[in-house]
Amino acid sequence: MSTDKQAAVAVVTGASRGAGKGIALALGAAGATVYVTGRSQRDGDADLPGTIHATAREIDALGGRGIAVACDHRDDAQVAALFERVAQQSGRLDILVNNATFLHDDLIKPGPFWSKPLDLVNILDVGLRSAYVASWHAAPLMVRQRRGLIAFTSSFGASCYMHGPGYGAQKVGVDKFAKDMAVDLREHNVAAVSIWMGMLDTERTQRVMQQHPEQYAGFAAMAESPQFTGRLIDALYRDPRLMEKSGMVLVGAELAQQYGIRDIDGRQPPSHRAMLGGPVQAHPAKVE
């Protein structure tokens, strides 16, 4: 994975399950040391299956090195301790994947935003603010080594109405983080990108499909595996022209076509740009 003989060191936030777990597994399969963060340490800690320790063990089995770190991304002190541990234990950080996101059980419940619980907006804490805090700690490590990639997981919810305004604002926010952090990081040869994932075949969506089979008929044929985005991040980090993509908001399925990457089942997931809209790239103007 790494451009030199050292295996890359990555931090993937929110990796007990879902997209974060899949990304961590894909990076581990490429040989990386992966710090996986989350709050779920034991089965039953969350309504959905998965723990950070289970993810770390799967990374080990795939040939990487998984390191589970319990971290509540609402707590800045815990996040600071995470990156201090990475620096002391590994001496470097090559990839940060900002994925941890608060997803309320009522997120996809039909109805206007005011009819849903107010704490749906906590996605702007764990999901937006948390990504800034993690990047703030990661950036100095990458700047020091003059190499690194900060990736944000995002979606077409930044373009169209999807799950309500809180969800959309979080996606737009991390896209803007990628654009603006790239400006600050460019002279240090550190890249920042945001990746729009498509529909994901995760533990959460599998449960929803079981509850509403007719509504989600045909979903599997279009869905991306959680590992798919991890394969893209691996390819991005290896790309000698990575800095040309820094600051961009990338549709994952389209990036996969550029790199010739397929999903774990051999399929080429489709882009939903025509149906859901596409990303708006940054204007080149810079105002200090």
Language model regions located:
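Canonical Rossmann dinucleotide-binding motif of NAD(H)/NADP(H)-dependent dehydrogenases/reductases
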Residues: 2-39
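Active-site loop of short-chain dehydrogenase/reductase
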Residues: 7-8, 64-65, 92-93, 110, ...
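Conserved glycine-rich Rossmann-like NAD(P)H-binding loop of the short-chain dehydrogenase/reductase
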Residues: 30-54
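The beta1-alpha1 cofactor-binding region of Rossmann-like NAD(H)/NADP(H)-dependent oxidoreductases
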Residues: 50, 70-82
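Catalytic loop of short-chain dehydrogenase/reductase
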Residues: 102-106, 114-119, 123, 149-187, ...
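A short, exposed helix-loop element centered on a Lys and neighboring polar residues
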Residues: 135-136, 179
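C-terminal helical subdomain
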Residues: 194, 211-288
